[in-house]
Amino acid sequence: MARLRRWHCYRKLEVPYTRVSRSKNKNYIPGAKPTMVRLFHMGELTRNPSEWQYEASLVAKENHQIRDNAIEAIRVMVNKYLESTLGKKRYLFIIRKYPHHIYREKPVVGGYAGADRISQGMRLSFGRPKGRAVQIYEGEKLLSIFFDDITKAKDIKYFLQVARSKLPWRYREEIVEVKSGKPLAL
């Protein structure tokens, strides 16, 4: 069974590798997979973010990369929690980062006799495109939840803590008033 390589190989930032085009002659990266994140805006889509009273966000504490299937897992989980506690029309959930970066993997042959005849070592060791990742920098918001009901702020903070536990590296939760920008003390 094919497995994903452990993410500690990729989570440090590198030069973005992103040139994908619909026309074949302009496409520098052949065989790049599409992103696994299907929706970036969920909930009440008719209201602008500035029309809500409160914003809860996950803010990165360090520069790093996140695989797109980790973001998709967080999206599904947080959206399910928000729908069950707040209802479909009482929040706006936005994923603020798009997985542009395409990470590569050089398959390592080993474990059987004659592997040295098959692999070329480090000659032309660029690797093949395996998936997409988000490159996020310190202080940037990965996702935001907009809401009006202050009594649900502790629930939303808990949802962000659960989402944070599924991500690599470190984040902090921020809940602020949209109009004034003042942080809420919970």
From Swiss-Prot:
Membrane spanning residue stretches: none
Signal sequence annotation: none
GO cellular component, one term: ribonucleoprotein complex
Top-level division of the source organism's lineage: Archaea
CDD domains: Ribosomal_L16_L10e (cd01433)
GO process terms (BP): translation
One example GO MF annotation: structural constituent of ribosome
UniProt KW keywords: Ribonucleoprotein, Ribosomal protein
Coiled coil: none
InterPro entries listed in its UniProt record: Ribosomal_uL16, Ribosomal_uL16_arc, Ribosomal_uL16_CS_euk_arc, Ribosomal_uL16_dom, Ribosomal_uL16_euk_arch, Ribosomal_uL16_sf
Recorded family membership: Belongs to the universal ribosomal protein uL16 family.
HAMAP family (alphabetical): Ribosomal_uL16_arch
Protein name: Large ribosomal subunit protein uL16
Gene giving rise to this polypeptide: rpl10e
